[in-house]
């Protein structure tokens, strides 16, 4: 019974990223075995045969000897200690050679048919010279290349490798790369080999979409949107090309016109013709007007107004208006009661061709809690804006509305927040700006704020006129109040001086009847 020890180099012994390898036995299955060379010579108890193990772990390592010596021993009953001693010695020798090479790379092993066939045909008596050995190792390096990224392993196994330098278009290269990635994933599904070349594989190769699995609804919508965009661009490009071609055709037709015709047209200018009208139309118009005048006698002004209102009403059916209308009935203007009723369906009706259809979804338009808000995006305050803020603060005080006019991109809320922030950070400077007042330059303020202010003299004249008018109205009001007070006082005096009705008694004698009391 024979066994083979598979040794692989490791990184530093204390590194926690070093991959771990364990010895395993070869399984007899349909899979291809690891390449090794054997000599068909009988073994005795004291003889040990050395073989060349060709593996990916040592194909690209920078070692002086390209072949690592391993031991294939046979369990012999005669001298078991010698075989175990030779095995341990060879393992130690391999470890020394491999630890001396710091530039080692880990990759996924691959087994090919061509090097197997080349090795199987070697006879036991074959002697590899130095040149033959170099040629043989070049062929092995060609098939056992470690510097292959993960996304191209399937291409290497097939013996094909696409690259951007080929004559294929970019589109075909992209499709072939996607196929390679999907094939790689399909090949590795359910297998135990999950080793990745960490020195060569990029994160983008692992994050790329291999195009395997069921498409989601979001992916389908994105594909549809991209297709519509490409289609619109293509139609626009075709329209521009057709317009340019038609323009070129028109220019060619104008250039190809005979020169003589153009000269004749230029030499004989055409007279401008005015179309006044045709005799038939004039005759028909005159006959129609005569028939109308004979059939309908001259209408009154009210009847003509009623006809005009009816025509306007028919024309305004499309443009619905909720204003009340009037009509003429028996020579009188009467309010149309039907116009007082408002039909909301007719009012809100919009023709189909004038409607604007807007399709909104989460892909084309993101709707969040801040979508319908009016909050402006805050901007950072630099040193220049801060100095400008302190200058405005010393001019206008804490009137943040006037200060906000000096900053077109900011509102009153942002100015107030800036004031609170500066009051916490630098209260001494804020107090100094509020105590020391600076003169106000209206020209600079109007230039910065974009508002036009009239001169102060005109404003003072207007204020003086307003004051005079106010004083005059006040004087008139006082005079009117005094007159009213005089009238009230006069009435009170008359009431006081008038005799009381209870003191005087009137007597009326009618037919011997005496009436005592006041006669009303």
Curated annotation (Swiss-Prot):
One GO MF term, please? RNA polymerase III general transcription initiation factor activity
Q: Name one GO biological process term.
A: RNA polymerase III preinitiation complex assembly
Q: Does the keyword 4Fe-4S apply?
A: no
Q: Which InterPro entries match?
A: Homeodomain-like_sf, SANT/Myb, SANT_dom, TFIIIB_B''_Myb
Annotated spans, Disordered: 1-94, 155-177, 233-297
Keywords, comma-separated and alphabetical: Activator, Nucleus, Transcription, Transcription regulation
Q: Which SUPFAM superfamilies match?
A: Homeodomain-like (SSF46689)
Q: SANT domain: from which residue to which, for each copy? A: 376-427
> Chief localization class?
nucleus
- Fill in the subunit field for this protein: TFIIIB comprises the TATA-binding protein (tbp1), the B-related factor (brf1) and the B'' component (bdp1).
Name of the protein described by the UniProt record: Transcription factor TFIIIB component B''
Q: Species name for this entry?
A: Schizosaccharomyces pombe (strain 972 / ATCC 24843)
Task: Name the gene.
Answer: bdp1
